Amino acid sequence: MTALRPSPFRLTDLTDCGGCAAKLGADLLAEALAGLGAEAAGAPDALIAGLDPPDDAAVYRVSDDLAIIGTLDFFPPLVDDPRTFGEIAAANALSDVFAMGGRVLFALSIAAFPEDLPAGVLTEIFAGASAKVREAGGTLGGGHTIRDPEPKYGLAVIGAAHPDRLLRKGGAEPGDVLLLTKALGTGVLVSGARQGRVSASDLDGAIDAMRRLNRAAADAFVSAGIRAATDVTGFGLLGHGLEMARASGRRFVFDAASLPALPGALELAAAGIETGGAAHNRRFVAGSLDVGAAVAPALVTLAHDPQTSGGLLAAIPSDRLASVESALARARVAHWRIGRVEAGEAGVALA
């Protein structure tokens, strides 16, 4: 009989890197996917979004007015409370459906779990995730669990959308305003918390942001006819911004002074706190990034910071900006104007 791990225990002690900071670097992932070559290029026409070019989720056209969205996301724990971990992991996985402009139908759990932890811990993770899936309008329909010394949890999510009303990474045009719907800094705050350098209130602020769904923001964008958006997660604001810029063939210019930061995040960044994932993000954007000489180093760190369950980044045509912001305000979705889209070589700038 396996001896159970002493209680109480800390989930974060069982992993070196939690949340979206554990994602494989975008540069290495791109290299791996490039090796697929003709296999990615040979997808059927019904696959609207897949590997070539990549987007936030796979989308398959079923009929003229129905497309099915499929996505998958999981990671090690970044908080110690099991139910909260389940909520955050679920919100993060569900976000890719919303980032495509879809509605959630159902989800399946993906879990890796140490045999020497009490089963009740896994129950709480499942319960947190199930509640969040219900909040998103779907249901948790099953899943698969394996043994693993390092716990991991996430979801495979199936959603639906009208194929002509999808949000995509491409489609941004010069003059569009860049809106962001969640403040930045979850990576540095979680990293700082592991070092005992974050107050309880600041950590609570990060947790509240991470378990907040992007559903209302996506609904507002789709209703306004917005087409260019993504969610900001493990590759950071600049990494995901660069993906949009490349997909659109445009230059994204972010106003560093306008970047919203979660309470405590800038102070930690200024003190040199950074996740391991941030180094991957810096390498990914290095050849396509211009940073203004006057931009504070802490803001550069914040712009590279891997986000877990971050907000939506959208390119809004100027003639729709007022209506979009009104819709977001009615839905009580926080949002910030953080930059603009310009003509020119695809890339990102922090000015």
Kindly label every feature range from the protein language model.
Residues 1-351:
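Helix-biased detector of long, well-ordered alpha-helical tracts
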